[in-house]
Amino acid sequence: MAELRALVAVKRVIDFAVKIRVKPDKSGVVTDGVKHSMNPFCEIAVEEAVRLKEKKLVKEIIAVSCGPPQCQETIRTALAMGADRGIHVEVPGAEAENLGPLQVARVLAKLAEKEKVDLLFLGKQAIDDDCNQTGQMTAGLLDWPQGTFASQVTLEGDKVKVEREIDGGLETIRLKLPAVVTADLRLNEPRYATLPNIMKAKKKKIEVIKAGDLGVDLTSKVSVISVEEPPQRLAGVKVETTEDLVAKLKEVGRI
């Protein structure tokens, strides 16, 4: 049991507290000079892997991120939380903006095979695109069982029991290892990295590779046509009678 190895995917996203601004040309959102941090659901995935290691159920945790050089900051955060080493799949800025779930899933699948891991943890979704697809696609490419929206994870020999949130309740499933698990909000509360661990993380190894080294083509067949802010919500108007209501609706062209 103690020989299990876990790969945890972490994504660098605009910090959840930042007000998003759309670029003037509507090609995307403004990222220059904007605070970034680890995707909150990825933090939960890292925390769960670390807890399993603390129980001596996992031997090694590898944190991986795809994107520009700044992604190494996100990997360092995972290392400070308790991951053992990192892998940075370097993708240039312009190409990184077009990375979709399928491209990342291909990278993760190759790394999972290369590193011979038993568990692949991801956040259930990222707060920037909210796709909720990468974990499922990775499991499909690997032909591994998957436990998505996990709210509880328990290792049982060569299986992992996952309690997952579904519409109207909870579902409990058992997956034969190796398996893919995506973390939901209620799985755990991630720890804050302590200063000593932050200092230790600076000495931990981060391997830098390119997608081509894995034989992965990052070309996307999906392109963003336009990104727009939601329309501003207009203030309501109080009316005294039904007749006034009908007149107002006619005035604004609703009837």
Swiss-Prot record:
Origin: domain of life: Eukaryota
Provide the GO biological process annotations: amino acid catabolic process; fatty acid beta-oxidation using acyl-CoA dehydrogenase; respiratory electron transport chain
Q: By its UniProt entry, which InterPro entries does this protein fall under?
A: ET-Flavoprotein_bsu_CS, ETF_a/b_N, ETF_b, ETF_beta_N, Rossmann-like_a/b/a_fold
A GO CC annotation given for this chain: electron transfer flavoprotein complex
Q: Which residues carry this modification: Phosphoserine?
A: S223, S226
Q: What is this protein called?
A: Electron transfer flavoprotein subunit beta
Compartments it resides in? Mitochondrion matrix
- Positions with a binding annotation for AMP: 9, 39-42, 66, 123-134
Positions of region (Recognition loop): 183-205
Identify the gene encoding this protein: Etfb
Functional description taken from the UniProt entry: Heterodimeric electron transfer flavoprotein that accepts electrons from several mitochondrial dehydrogenases, including acyl-CoA dehydrogenases, glutaryl-CoA and sarcosine dehydrogenase. It transfers the electrons to the main mitochondrial respiratory chain via ETF-ubiquinone oxidoreductase. Required for normal mitochondrial fatty acid oxidation and normal amino acid metabolism. ETFB binds an AMP molecule that probably has a purely structural role.
**Quaternary structure and interacting proteins, as annotated:** Heterodimer composed of ETFA and ETFB. Identified in a complex that contains ETFA, ETFB and ETFRF1. Interacts with ACADM.
Classification lineage: Eukaryota, Metazoa, Chordata, Craniata, Vertebrata
Where are the N6-acetyllysine modifications? K200, K210, K238, K248
